[in-house]
Design a protein with these regions (language model features):
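Polybasic/polar functional segments that serve as interface/processing modules
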Residues: 1-91
Length: 91
């Protein structure tokens, strides 16, 4: 398994993301909604409305990686706004 470097940043896509999107759709969201470069090597994390699925998009030198995690019984705590991110990061 390839792991990102220590300089890699993690960006959360706030709110809900349609989990039917795959690499192409998520990379467009990174460019248009987040105004970031999907080829930067940083991690871009997306969550669905039910908060039980995460997808992580990552550019790995010669292609995209798309990691997915689905919880069967529990839910991810996911921010809806940047204010929630600020509040959670100070705890």
């Amino acid at each position: 398994m390839l792991l990102p470097s220590a300089q890699t940043r993690v960006y959360l896509a706030l709110g809900n993301t349609d989990m039917r999107k795959a690499i192409n759709g998520l990379s467009i969201l990174v460019q248009e909604s987040m105004d970031l470069d999907p080829f930067s090597g940083h991690l871009f994390v997306f969550c669905n409305r039910k908060r039980n699925i995460l997808k992580i998009l990552y550019w790995d030198r010669n292609g995209f990686c798309l990691w997915s995690k689905r919880l069967e019984k529990h839910f991810f705590r996911w921010p809806e706004s940047s204010e929630e991110v600020d509040r959670k990061s100070t705890r």
